[in-house]
Swiss-Prot record:
It catalyses: Endohydrolysis of (1->4)-beta-D-glucosidic linkages in cellulose, lichenin and cereal beta-D-glucans. It is an enzyme of class 3 (hydrolase). Keywords: Carbohydrate metabolism, Cellulose degradation, Disulfide bond, Glycoprotein, Glycosidase, Hydrolase, Polysaccharide degradation, Signal. Belongs to the glycosyl hydrolase 45 (cellulase K) family. It comes from Hypocrea jecorina. GO terms for cellular component: extracellular region. This is Endoglucanase-5. Residues 184-201 have a biased composition (Low complexity). InterPro entries: CBD_sf, Cellulose-bd_dom_fun, Expansin/allergen_DPBB_dom, Glyco_hydro_45, RlpA-like_sf. The active site is at D27, D134.
Length: 242
């Protein structure tokens, strides 16, 4: 399993407190969210749009209650921002820091057979991270096994439309997946964590469009720059949307 993050267009958003490892895969199969058919995956799963992809999530992202089909995390989207670092010196080369993509969860990366990368709920993988995204791609996207900062976001319009073609729409489990803790993951040996700023974005204390504006533990701006409105996505995340 070789990791990949996408070199898509940069996406403006809030800095996330959560980190995950990434890899990439392509098996052409339907996946655990029912996106595809017995003959294979839907074509859009290789790339919904510019900078928007699909991924298999580790169990805590797919379903915290342990479901392996139609998990509560199916159809949810996340913004991934590259830290530029690989999880270890021998398991990837990393990539350019600061580049972002969006992924929609359409499959499960189970711990069984993938323990190196995909942890159980409440556990960590071999590199000390609690979350993992295995991005569906046939070629490298924006790095080689890059560690990312991630946060839940509203799915872009095309992703939401594509999700509507999957078998698991309306059939997902109902546990509050994902339950994001305070674990920010590990720092690769011999490296320093990326610098972050605690200052609110410019604009008189208002958040920029598509940035975070609320959610459990959020201490940043709660109003949005025009034309944005702060809209609740779930109990952990509210986002400035047009």
């Amino acid at each position: 399993m070789k990791a990949t993050l996408v070199l898509g267009s940069l996406i403006v958003g809030a800095v996330s407190a959560y980190k995950a490892t990434t890899t990439r895969y392509y098996d052409g199969q339907e996946g655990a969210c029912g996106c595809g058919s017995s003959s294979g995956a839907f074509p859009w799963q290789l790339g919904i749009g510019n900078g928007v992809y699909t991924a298999a999530g580790s169990q805590a992202l797919f379903d915290t209650a342990g479901a392996s089909w139609c998990g509560a995390g199916c159809g949810k989207c996340y913004q991934l921002t590259s830290t530029g670092q690989a999880p270890c010196s021998s398991c990837g080369t990393g990539g350019a820091a600061g580049q972002s993509i969006i992924v929609m969860v359409t499959n499960l990366c189970p711990n069984n057979g993938n323990a190196q990368w995909c942890p159980v709920v409440g556990g960590t993988n071999q590199y000390g991270y609690s979350y993992h995204f295995d991005i569906m791609a046939q070629n490298e996207i924006f790095g080689d096994n890059v560690v990312v900062d991630f946060e839940p976001i509203a799915c872009p319009g095309q992703a939401a439309s594509d999700w509507g073609t999957c078998l698991c729409v309306g059939q997902q489990e109902t546990d509050p997946t994902p339950v994001l803790g305070n674990d920010t993951g590990s720092t690769p040996p011999g490296s320093s964590p990326p610098a972050t700023s605690s200052s609110p974005p410019s604009g008189g204390g208002q958040q920029t469009l598509y940035g975070q504006c609320g959610g459990a533990g959020w201490t940043g701006p709660t109003t949005c720059q025009a034309p944005g409105t702060c809209k609740v996505q779930n109990q952990w995340y509210s986002q400035c949307l047009p």
